Design a protein with these regions (language model features):
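Nucleic-acid substrate recognition interfaces
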Residues: 1-145
């Protein structure tokens, strides 16, 4: 059985410098998500973490100054968002002209949407930070709560 623990936290900072540092981290994470989203959109919707990691990992670390876990979390966040949109699009049908049935009559042809129907990359607008921990760490955290 898989257990997921989701927490919303409210931080109270001791100084404005701490607040600015945390906000800068949130902005860097959001910008990295937008960067990876553009890469996915313009490179035939690559949704495999290993391919994204080999293409963008070092560049993300250098350009946005993210730590290793945050960089991996960027990939997971972008892939999850694109897969969610892909699932939502599959439910919609689009009329695609007519085709002939077995008796030679014209019948409407419908196709299901996929990610190629997107006009622009998915954009991350709000400052955010999603850290996904492994199951062992999560279970240790749950034991101490």
């Amino acid at each position: 059985m898989e257990i997921n623990l989701t927490s919303k936290l409210r931080f109270v900072f001791q100084s404005d410098a701490d607040r600015k540092s945390a906000y800068d981290t949130l902005i860097a994470y959001r910008d990295a998500c937008n960067y990876v989203s553009q890469y996915v959109f313009y490179n035939d919707f690559v949704l495999r973490q290993s391919e994204l990691q080999s293409a963008l990992y070092h560049e993300l670390r250098k350009r946005f100054g993210l730590k290793s876990q945050m960089t991996q979390s960027v990939f997971k966040t972008v892939i999850a968002r694109y897969k969610t949109v892909q699932t939502q699009l599959r439910k919609q049908r689009v009329w695609d002209g007519y085709k002939k049935d077995n008796h030679g009559k014209d019948v409407p042809n419908y196709i299901h949407k996929d990610l190629t129907f997107l006009w622009k990359p998915i954009e991350f607008k709000r400052p955010q930070l999603d850290l996904v921990r492994n199951l062992i760490t999560a279970s240790k955290i749950m034991c101490y709560l």
